[in-house]
Every structure is written in structure tokens, then in C-alpha cells.
Amino acid sequence: MNTLNYGITGNCRTAALISETGNIEWLCFPDFDSPSIFASLLDREKGGSFGFEVSDDYRITQSYVPHTNILSTQFSSREGEFVVLDYMPCYRSKDGTGHYLPAELYRYIHWLKGKPR
């Protein structure tokens, strides 16, 4: 059985579950009651995911950017280092009375040093 050690990012409209190795393994899109786009959490062969393949010598850590829904997954090895930021935006309306929740998932990959493989 898989561990259930997942990070989550969402915007009150939907959410993505991101494994401790940085793979998006569950995402219903654009809403919680929509069909899944990624579902390898339930079926590794048919479910699909969006992630990275790195060598076994990488150290992978996850944390949230303080006071945000932005999940940071950092990949470090002797070869190089990079960080992946995952988030779903949630905007306040211009008049401040509500929120705009676009159906968007952002995955920002930031190179830090070396030549990651």
C-alpha cells in the first residue's frame, strides 16, 4: 500500500495532490466534481501523473511558502538543484466582496544550480 504523504494545493474550486517525490497524482479539473485528469493515486498503470524522473541520489523535500497555498518541492543532489512550485490562484474581486477562482494549476520549475538530470 502507498503511503498517503501528499502535499495539496487548491483554490476552493478544486485541488491537486502532489506526492513527496513531486508528482501530481490526483487532480479533478476544473472542479471537485469533474472527472480526474491525473489519477495515479488510484491506479498506477492507468491513472496518469505529471512529475519528474530523477536519479536515486536526489534528496527531495517539501514545504509550503509561508502563509500561502504554494507547495515547494526541492530536488537536491551533487549534480544540481532545482525547485518546483505548485499553486492554484485565488483572486479577490476588485470590489473586495468575493473571489475569482480560475481553473488554473501553475507549475513553476526554477533551476538553482548545477546541471540537474
Question: What is each stretch, according to the model?
Answer:
Residues 2-20, 24-117:
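Beta-sandwich/jelly-roll carbohydrate-recognition scaffolds of carbohydrate-active enzymes
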